[in-house]
Swiss-Prot record:
It holds the Pfam family ADK. Monomer. Transmembrane segments: none annotated. This is Adenylate kinase. Residues 30-59 are annotated as: NMP. Catalyzes the reversible transfer of the terminal phosphate group between ATP and AMP. Plays an important role in cellular energy homeostasis and in adenine nucleotide metabolism.
Length: 192
């Protein structure tokens, strides 16, 4: 099962990705985790990514695309994967499609979690409170101003992916406002 999870920040993509991975025994491919791993291993592409990050610039699409392509080649992805946080743009989606075709693979589904933006802000605030209570580190972008910027960026860059995947008959919409377990059940239903 090869799945892409879409949805705005705070929609629960990471939570649902973990549940799908447990159910289907496939890895979660998070761009953040993959970037950290290639940097930690000091691979050639990891060195390039680290240089961009150290220079204060976004890691280029070409590097992110290569990291994802290389990760899909690893043996634990043979039976599938859940992509979380990638693709973020139609350009990345087009590259992903080409990469998968070159490997004789294709996506099985693209799940978009539909969530009310006001509710997302409340979720973010709750996550901050829970993290503080647990003595954890609060993400630097977990504040209302940064969160609003992330939502704008999502609407401008990532939301157009819905139409891209709808045209390819891969898009499945799931209400992300219901409970975590119920969202998971709905996802399993649309994957059948």
């Amino acid at each position: 099962m090869r799945i892409v999870l879409l949805g705005p920040p705070g929609a629960g993509k990471g939570t649902q990705a973990k549940m799908l991975c447990e159910e289907y025994h496939i890895p979660q491919l998070s761009t953040g985790d993959m970037l950290r791993e290639v940097i930690r291993r000091e691979t050639e592409i990891g060195k390039k990514a680290k240089a961009m990050i150290n220079a204060g610039t976004l890691v280029s699409d070409s590097i992110v695309n290569q990291i994802v392509s290389d990760r899909i080649d690893e043996s634990d992805c043979i039976n599938g994967f859940v992509l979380d946080g990638y693709p973020r743009t139609v350009g990345q989606a087009e590259v992903l499609q080409q990469v998968l075709q070159s490997k004789n693979m294709q996506l099985d589904a693209v799940i978009e979690l539909i969530v009310d933006e006001d509710a997302l802000l409340e979720r973010m605030k709750k996550r901050v409170q829970e993290t503080i209570i647990a003595g954890g580190q609060v993400r630097s972008d977990d504040n209302p101003v940064a969160f609003a910027k992330r939502l704008v960026e999502y609407r401008e860059k990532t939301a157009p992916l819905s139409e891209f995947y709808l045209q390819r008959r891969l898009l499945k919409l799931v209400d992300g406002m219901i409970g975590v377990t119920e969202v998971s059940r709905k996802i399993r239903e649309v994957l059948k």
